[in-house]
Regions:
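Small cysteine-rich, disulfide-bonded extracellular modules of the LU/uPAR three-finger superfamily
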Residues: 1-88, 94-139
């Protein structure tokens, strides 16, 4: 099996590059949580997926990476969800609205990049993420 094992300095630089992309523009990044099938890639326009909630990152989103981990600063929840549905994925955007990346959303223990205590979102109810980390793998 072919693989790459980047040095810690490179892993930190990769995480910091994501952080730089999150912090583009003059305001905070956002986390848009959707139901439905995740887009083919982060450049694919949203189709029939339903926007359930929008959360707001701090500005900047995170301090510099340490030990190849980007630890997000506080994330402001959505006090009133946009729609009712099952959260399955998220699109993370910078303050200009440009997509930075898409990722999976699952309930705690489900292995998603974003984990929620429940993926059942109810319109008008609060949605929150208490913490967030992004880890650049060692292989």
């Amino acid at each position: 099996m072919a693989n790459i094992r980047p040095a810690l300095a490179l892993r930190n630089a990769l995480a910091d590059t994501i952080n730089t992309a999150l912090n583009a523009g003059s305001g905070p990044a956002t986390i848009e949580i959707y139901s439905g099938t995740i887009a083919t890639n982060a450049d694919t326009a949203i189709g029939a997926q339903v926007l359930l909630a929008v959360l707001t990152c701090s500005d900047p989103a995170a301090p510099s990476a340490s030990a190849s981990v980007l630890t997000f600063s506080s994330i402001t929840g959505d006090s009133s969800a946009n729609a009712t549905g099952t959260a399955t994925w998220a699109r993370i955007k910078d303050s200009t609205g440009a997509t930075v990346f898409d990722c999976s959303v699952t309930a705690t223990g489900g292995g998603g990049v974003i984990t929620l205590n429940t993926t059942s979102i109810v319109s008008g109810s609060p949605v929150s993420i208490t913490s967030g980390t992004l880890t650049v793998p060692t292989t």
